[in-house]
Swiss-Prot record:
InterPro entries: F-box-assoc_dom_typ3, F-box-assoc_interact_dom, F-box-like_dom_sf, F-box_dom. It holds the Pfam family F-box. This is Putative F-box protein At1g19160. Residues 1-45 form the F-box domain. Signal peptide: none annotated. Coiled coil: none annotated. It comes from the Eukaryota. CDD domains: F-box_AtFBW1-like.
Amino acid sequence: MIPEDPLVEILLRLPVKSLARFLCVSKRCYSIIRSRHFINLYQSRASTRESRVMFAFRDTNTFFRWNFFSLSQPPSSVTNIDSTSYCMPVCVNGLICVEHMFRLWICNPVTKKITLFPDCGPRKQFTTWYMGYDPINYQYKVLYLSREHLIAPYIVEVFTFGDEGSWRMIEADENFHSPETRGVCTHGVLYYGAYTGDGAKIVRFDVRTEKFGKFIEMPAEACSIHGVYLGLYTLLDYQGKLGLLATQATSTYDLWVLEDAEKHEWSKVSIFITREMCPYDLIWPGVVGFVAGSGELIVTARDELGQFHILYVDLKKNRSREVWFEEITPSFGSALVLAFTDYVESIVLM
């Protein structure tokens, strides 16, 4: 019999699909893989592995279905998830969270396992939610905000996935705000744009302590150029930092990167996609993210024939490379596209 320590080390090196098969090999393997200690070790090592990009497409022909594709070798379809909500799906540290039929669901795209979150009480008219990950305690949490009418303050609740408990209400009276943008979770902090009594701000929420920090001021230059309407900005992860992207003109973008949240310090990166970078005459190119590690720009667009393209643009080397999914049809050209740039396999929900 293999001693436990070497066996654990062997199991830690396996991909999630192989671990799922090992659950049926023996009671010993099952006990190890299901243990909290092993799950924490696996999640910790997963964060050090090279991340991949997960794309989500909502086809115009299947408006209520999201199609997820992983940029592996070769690129492949991961899973399809129905969603009747206008809220966008979220992918954090390997798990996908969606809203369907007014309920929240969480899915592991590798194992195809889906589970339903507990109901958080009577449904209110205005709701929004975000998912974050605590890399210290290896916990997934959902932040849920709801209110009865537009002028009422939001009720804020948190649920820790994997716990047998219920939704917990947290204090947020001193941080009254109205969420507006998609969220970005990096290094255990969840960020999103919101309107407050003092205008547009960036909200930060510590996933581990479940506490809101002081609002972050929008970069002054961004407000003077693009205005304070948050719908003009896209929040994204830029090399592990919060990025605020705005379109200057066709193929021209301004990116502000949060350098110090306490001092409200931002740096600016100007982006211009030249004809030399793209081998096609692209129509309505759009930036959807940055590749973790390489910093390549992810651009989606259609050509004059309506064919859909995904390009990785290297701004330093002034060149691009195309990503191709055989499953994507021309109808995706007018679809909504999301990119989750730090996707890693998760052992949770296996």
